[in-house]
Amino acid sequence: MTLSPEKQHVRPRDAADNDPVAVARGLAEKWRATAVERDRAGGSATAEREDLRASGLLSLLVPREYGGWGADWPTAIEVVREIAAADGSLGHLFGYHLTNAPMIELIGSQEQEEHLYTQIAQNNWWTGNASSENNSHVLDWKVRATPTEDGGYVLNGTKHFCSGAKGSDLLFVFGVVQDDSPQQGAIIAAAIPTSRAGVTPNDDWAAIGMRQTDSGSTDFHNVKVEPDEVLGAPNAFVLAFIQSERGSLFAPIAQLIFANVYLGIAHGALDAAREYTRTQARPWTPAGIQQATEDPYTIRSYGEFTIALQGADAAAREAAHLLQTVWDKGDALTPEDRGELMVKVSGVKALATNAALNISSGVFEVIGARGTHPRYGFDRFWRNVRTHSLHDPVSYKIADVGKHTLNGQYPIPGFTS
């Protein structure tokens, strides 16, 4: 195959022999010390991304026969949550990396799977995505893919919200075949080197949260896509959605990862608030107590936070195990399998979103006015959850669950459902 980015990053030989969750916790402990400062600065988390590269975790889901960790989905989800607890931006970046790589297996060929998985594992490649566009609606894609005589394409246009594209080695991109081609209107997917001539990830990401995710735009100017870099036939993803084939698992995978990013952030907010309440919060004088930790209303709040997380965590872990069961069915996947998984994941997404938003804003009630000082950075938890939770309206996830409960309907397969 032609896809061989110039950057080579040799993977630690014994990485896959370690416990990935323990590795993630070690990294999280290191990053937690600089999270507030880095959030304030914004920009790129270059050093932290290199930490992840050196850890070998970028090949977490790569099968062992290709040199990866060979982790299952429940383990991968746990790693995402650990990272997000320390830094929402890094949890976001790593989560997106985990949604990108499975596309190789979901719609690519056996040859592409072997080649790309091996390269990711051996060279510790970061993957980035270039799918969304900032047009009239979410699927109004204008990046054009012009077919070439050799079976490849040439891409032109601009993608937006390209999380992780900057600093990545392998870029997953979608384009629409131009109107004067026999394939007109078809959506093509490809995995290309980010260093390919004509690919320009831009430094134009600006939002109230997720400030170190490099989620800005990426320009494509006469970018050549080689024939063996095209994943599946034109409209492979669309057909997978229509027929509830294995490729349609992209949506529940992505949504479950997003939910666990939120849960990780909620855990991070709760842990940080608890430490502050124990060590710095002042008791309310009329309460007649000596320590803030004795306040009955504060105690109740921490109980409510914890209970909300217990329920959401349990649902998320149950969904991760169901994902593994469905994933293992391979091509024997049925529409019912896919539908049951998506309903479960939709419920988790709603639980996680509500818990994370409530906890990340509610912690201010238990830390008090002094805790709002910027040096503590408590606001970053809410800003991160609020920013990413707008990715797709959670109300539609709740409606999907309701339609199934009331009418036995499964969500219509798509990029977010």
From Swiss-Prot:
Protein origin, superkingdom: Bacteria
Entries under CDD domains matching the protein: DszC
Temperature dependence: Optimum temperature is 40 degrees Celsius.
Cysteines engaged in disulfide bonds, as pairs: none
Localization per record: Cytoplasm
Matching SUPFAM superfamilies: Acyl-CoA dehydrogenase C-terminal domain-like, Acyl-CoA dehydrogenase NM domain-like
Region (Lid loop) location: 131-142
Record keyword Ribosomal protein present: no
Comment on pH dependence: Optimum pH is 8.0.
Transmembrane domains' residue ranges: none
Reaction(s) catalysed (UniProt annotation): dibenzothiophene + 2 FMNH2 + 2 O2 = dibenzothiophene 5,5-dioxide + 2 FMN + 2 H2O + 2 H(+); dibenzothiophene + FMNH2 + O2 = dibenzothiophene 5-oxide + FMN + H2O + H(+); dibenzothiophene 5-oxide + FMNH2 + O2 = dibenzothiophene 5,5-dioxide + FMN + H2O + H(+)
Region described as Central beta-barrel N-terminus: spans on this chain: 125-233
Gene Ontology CC terms, in alphabetical order: cytoplasm
Main location: cytoplasm
Example of a GO biological process term: L-leucine catabolic process
EC number: 1.14.14.21
UniProt-annotated binding residues for FMN: 96, 129-134, 159-163, 282, 369-370, 391
Subunit (UniProt): Homotetramer formed by a dimer of dimers; FMN binds between monomers of the homodimer.
Family under the similarity heading: Belongs to the DszC flavin monooxygenase family.
Anything else known: Reduced flavin is provided by flavin reductase DszD.
Family matches, as PANTHER family: ACYL-COA DEHYDROGENASE (PTHR43884), ISOVALERYL-COA DEHYDROGENASE, MITOCHONDRIAL-RELATED (PTHR43884:SF12)
Comment on protein domains: Has 3 domains, the helical N-terminus (residues 18-124), a beta-barrel central domain (125-233) and a helical C-terminus (234-417). The lid loop (residues 131-142) change conformation when FMN is bound and close the FMN-binding site. Other regions that probably contribute to FMN binding are residues 178-184 and 281-291.
Name of the protein this chain belongs to: Dibenzothiophene monooxygenase
Species this protein is from: Rhodococcus erythropolis (Arthrobacter picolinophilus)
Gene behind the chain: dszC
